[in-house]
């Protein structure tokens, strides 16, 4: 039989105090909704239907082309949300997972186990439950002496005995699909909230003597539903621990994993060393034996093997093998650094390609440049690429030596093996093998300093 999935993502999330739909708030680099969608993939659903509502267009954009969508224009409860999927799923034979889009910590393994449990026990409905020493506020799972599920009782309706139950409802379920939609026709809004509850379906199945079961999560953290910023931070913390643990098991060294922030899609090779307060975001890839020191921040970038990045920022760029960057360097988007390049302290590179073995040791700006191999930038070199309206390109050939405190005004080209004298302002192309000097001639006026106030003779 087929599996189907319904993801509930229509809510506004008032307690988040945000214009962004709740399910689009991010945990470890991707939205909560994407986390749930990826985990749902473990059950290989034939159809996945996502119920949208508040700012539906934003939610649909995130999963465009990956799921079918239905709209819940009025948020009238979880049962009502599932009703919205009727045109797509009613009458199909199979098992349907119903899950909230604000549960980013649920794993694919747990959802697969839930489905298997449901099928193996021939249940018409199976509740995903968890156990906690502090069940206050959760619906409790009431079982009989044979451990069969009798009902779900909410906190406000629970007896003193029922309040002692530690098994709680996580809000995730599996149903026989055909029976689900038959039962939905019989639920109503006769409750304090005036809403249709999916839990009422469980009651209907019990009344008709059909088999209802419960599968208990091994890890309570997976049950977390995010309703406010506090829970969002908790989810981020748990996810970060999971991610860092995975990398450590796979051969990555962390000085302080609790103070290291790595997004879920980051890839890290063997023998990488990561110090505290390192952040790796987006689609970043780190090559083997690279060292990332305290304070390094890398976004959507590829760093090769054996690199050393010291307290620096790299954004949307590629860094080849053996490169050293920092401290206090900034590699801005659309830059590429060739093998063995050295970018030192207080150097900024923007939108530039730099050939292998090139060095910019300190206090340099390289913007909109095409730089060859074995180039040396002296301290204080500035490539001037912007005239207030347009940006221009500088081309620097191989084996060029740029003296300290030089200003290179684009558009300009420095030929192979050329040399720029220290303190020069370069406004014209420099031919290959030439020396360019663009500075005022030094004039010494003998004894002139004796006329000035600072001279000891005038004190």
Curated annotation (Swiss-Prot):
Residue positions binding acetyl-CoA: 379, 385-386, 404, 422, 439
EC number: 2.7.7.23, 2.3.1.157
Residue numbers spanned by region Linker: 230-250
UniProt-annotated location(s): Cytoplasm
InterPro entries the UniProt entry points to: Bifunctional_GlmU, GlmU-like, GlmU_C_LbH, Hexapep, Hexapep_transf_CS, NTP_transferase_dom, Nucleotide-diphossugar_trans, Trimer_LpxA-like_sf
Entry binding sites for Mg(2+): 102, 227
Subunit structure: Homotrimer.
Sequence similarity: In the N-terminal section; belongs to the N-acetylglucosamine-1-phosphate uridyltransferase family. In the C-terminal section; belongs to the transferase hexapeptide repeat family.
UniProt name for this protein: Bifunctional protein GlmU
Organism this protein belongs to: Streptococcus pneumoniae (strain JJA)
Gene: glmU
């Amino acid at each position: 039989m087929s599996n189907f999935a319904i993801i509930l993502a229509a809510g506004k999330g008032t307690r988040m105090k945000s214009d962004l739909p709740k399910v689009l708030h991010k945990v470890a680099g991707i939205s909560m909704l994407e986390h749930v969608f990826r985990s749902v993939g473990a059950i290989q659903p034939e159809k996945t239907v996502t119920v949208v509502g508040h700012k539906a267009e934003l939610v649909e954009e995130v999963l465009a082309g990956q799921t079918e969508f239905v709209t819940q224009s009025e948020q009238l409860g979880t049962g009502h949300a599932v009703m919205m999927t009727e045109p797509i799923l009613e009458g199909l034979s199979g098992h349907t997972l119903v899950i909230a889009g604000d549960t980013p910590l649920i794993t694919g393994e747990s959802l697969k186990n839930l489905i298997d449990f449901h099928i193996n026990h021939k249940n018409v409905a199976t509740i995903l439950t968890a156990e906690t020493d502090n069940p206050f506020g959760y619906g409790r799972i009431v079982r009989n002496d044979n451990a069969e599920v009798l009902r779900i009782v909410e906190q406000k309706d629970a007896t003193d005995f029922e309040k002692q139950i530690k098994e709680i409802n996580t809000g995730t379920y599996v149903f026989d699909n055909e029976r689900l939609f038959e039962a939905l026709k019989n639920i109503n809004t006769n409750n304090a909230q005036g809403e249709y509850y999916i839990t009422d379906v469980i009651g209907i199945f019990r009344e008709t003597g059909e088999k209802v079961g419960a599968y208990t999560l091994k890890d309570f953290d997976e049950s977390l539903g995010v309703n406010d910023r506090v829970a969002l931070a908790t989810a981020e913390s748990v996810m970060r621990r999971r991610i860092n643990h995975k990398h450590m098991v796979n051969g990555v060294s962390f000085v302080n994993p609790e103070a290291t922030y790595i997004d879920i899609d980051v890839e890290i090779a063997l023998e990488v060393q990561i110090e505290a307060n390192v952040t790796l975001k987006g689609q970043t890839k780190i090559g083997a034996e690279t060292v990332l020191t305290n304070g390094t921040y890398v976004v959507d970038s590829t760093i090769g093997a054996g690199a050393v990045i010291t307290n620096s920022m790299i954004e949307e760029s590629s860094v080849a093998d053996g490169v050293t960057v920092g401290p206090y360097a900034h590699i801005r988007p659309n830059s590429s650094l060739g093998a063995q390049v050295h970018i030192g302290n207080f150097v900024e590179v923007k939108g530039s390609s730099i050939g292998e073995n090139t060095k910019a040791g300190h206090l340099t700006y390289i913007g909109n440049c095409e730089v060859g191999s074995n180039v040396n930038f002296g301290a204080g070199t500035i490539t001037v690429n912007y005239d207030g309206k347009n940006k221009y390109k500088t081309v620097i050939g191989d084996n060029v030596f740029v003296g300290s405190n030089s200003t290179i005004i684009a558009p300009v080209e420095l030929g192979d093996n050329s040399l720029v004298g220290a303190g020069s302002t370069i406004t014209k192309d420099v031919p290959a093998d030439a020396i360019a000097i663009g500075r005022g001639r030094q004039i010494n006026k003998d004894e002139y300093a004796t006329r000035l106030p600072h001279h000891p003779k005038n004190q």
